[in-house]
């Protein structure tokens, strides 16, 4: 029986495409939440609670693995805030960790409840998963490398800023990370 990975894709992502497809190609079964359809219709708080419930009910063991990408990582970080520190392994790729602005592209994004996450981190009350790492591209304008570095430093989380990569980390880089992380 294949090990099941709990996967949270970025906004508008499906479990069986892109990274989910690669995880299945490597022999894993995928569970989690596509960020489309019925799940996407839920309020942010209900999405977060649904993920927290999923983790408590089916993925709360030491060998459990969670992979989250972009906005899926933001959802995970908020779900984790409702739970004790996760005891399995967590991999966050191009994680959205708060609001961002890019003057060059004239784009900005303020995700829901950024103040909740920030306050928990700043007060030392965020329940840090036991085994977590984050990877972000140095040229990522959606997942600010500076914000990922600040979060990683404050919480003592391993992070990597990947030179010359943007929000969509290259398949070659992600493949190398998965080769090591999935062991």
Say what each PLM segment does.
Residues 127-129, 133-136:
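Short beta-strand/loop motif that positions the catalytic acidic residue
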Residues 141-147, 170:
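Conserved alpha/beta-hydrolase "acid-adjacent" motif
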Residues 2-61:
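Active-site catalytic motif of lipid deacylating hydrolases and related acyltransferases
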Residues 67-77:
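Gly/Ala-rich beta-loop-alpha elbow adjacent to hydrolase catalytic centers
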Residues 30-31, 149, 153-168:
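Catalytic histidine neighborhood in serine/cysteine hydrolases
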Residues 41-42, 165-176:
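Catalytic histidine-centered segment of alpha/beta-hydrolase-like enzymes
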Residues 35-38, 91-100:
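Active-site nucleophile loop of the alpha/beta-hydrolase fold
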Residues 44-47, 95-122, 173-174:
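Flexible "cap/lid" loop of the alpha/beta hydrolase fold
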């Amino acid at each position: 029986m294949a090990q099941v990975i709990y996967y949270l894709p970025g906004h508008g992502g499906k479990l069986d495409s892109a990274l989910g497809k690669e995880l299945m190609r490597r022999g894993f079964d995928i569970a989690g939440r596509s960020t489309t359809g019925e799940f996407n219709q839920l309020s942010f708080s209900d999405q977060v609670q649904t993920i927290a419930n999923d983790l408590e009910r089916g993925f709360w063991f030491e060998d459990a693995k969670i992979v989250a990408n972009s906005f899926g990582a933001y959802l995970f970080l908020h779900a984790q805030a409702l739970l004790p520190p996760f005891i399995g392994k967590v991999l966050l790729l191009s994680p959205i960790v708060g609001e961002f602005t890019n003057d060059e592209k004239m784009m900005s994004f303020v995700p829901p409840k950024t103040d909740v996450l920030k306050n928990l981190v700043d007060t030392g009350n965020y329940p840090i998963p036991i085994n977590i790492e984050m990877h972000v591209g140095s040229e990522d304008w959606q997942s600010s490398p500076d914000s990922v570095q600040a979060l990683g430093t404050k919480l003592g989380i391993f992070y990597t800023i990947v030179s010359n990569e943007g929000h969509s980390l290259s398949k070659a880089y992600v493949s190398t990370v998965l080769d090591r992380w999935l062991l």
